[in-house]
Regions:
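Alpha/beta-hydrolase fold nucleophile elbow
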Residues: 117-127
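Alpha/beta-hydrolase active-site loop
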Residues: 94-116, 135
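N-terminal cap/lid segment of alpha/beta-hydrolase-fold proteins
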Residues: 1-42
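A conserved short beta-strand
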Residues: 144-154
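Short glycine-enriched nucleophile-adjacent loop
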Residues: 130-143
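Surface-exposed, active-site-proximal loop segments in enzymatic domains
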Residues: 86-95
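Short substrate-entry loop that stabilizes the transition state in hydrolases
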Residues: 43-45, 50-87
């Protein structure tokens, strides 16, 4: 059994990494929906920020999420596509980019850091989301977007 808490973050939509590094404040603003899954217990829980691939969220992702919950970890699903009125980027990788999803992940991290139920925060992703998890460890990005993640899995 687990609890789901929904929250939103104010994010940005940079087209490419260069825009994060040079002019993030001039990129379009967007509100991104997130779902925080909490395992049984009191916490604080380690948390995995989870990012989908180009097909968006699929049923098999829930198997991984359930595994993390069963292991006592919280999971934060970020809905980067739906929040931008996109279902998939399989045929158009430019409609939602990994740069946009990077900002979403760091903005969600900022909110989670304030939650007393959450301890250390890692990041994981599938396919496109894995690219985000990889770039989230790059120091120039971390210096601009916020605190580093405690773990990375892509």
């Amino acid at each position: 059994m687990f609890v789901v808490e929904r929250f939103q973050v104010q994010s940005r939509s940079p087209f490419e990494l260069h825009q994060i590094l040079t002019r993030l404040e001039k990129t379009p603003e967007t509100t991104v929906d997130c779902e925080l899954y909490l395992p049984e217990g009191e916490g604080p829980f380690g948390c995995v920020i989870a990012l989908h691939g180009s097909l968006g969220w699929a049923y098999h992702h829930q198997d991984h999420i359930n595994g993390w919950l069963d292991a006592g970890l919280a999971v934060c699903k970020i809905n980067s596509f739906i929040s931008r009125s996109i279902d998939t980027t399989v045929d158009d990788q430019l409609s939602v980019t990994h740069a946009m999803m990077l900002v979403d992940a760091f903005r969600a991290r900022e909110v989670l850091e304030q939650n007393p139920k959450i301890g250390k925060i890692g990041i994981s992703g599938w396919s496109l989301g894995g690219t985000v998890a990889l770039y989230s460890a790059w120091n120039p990005i971390v210096e601009i977007l916020g605190n580093p993640f405690d773990a990375h899995l892509s």
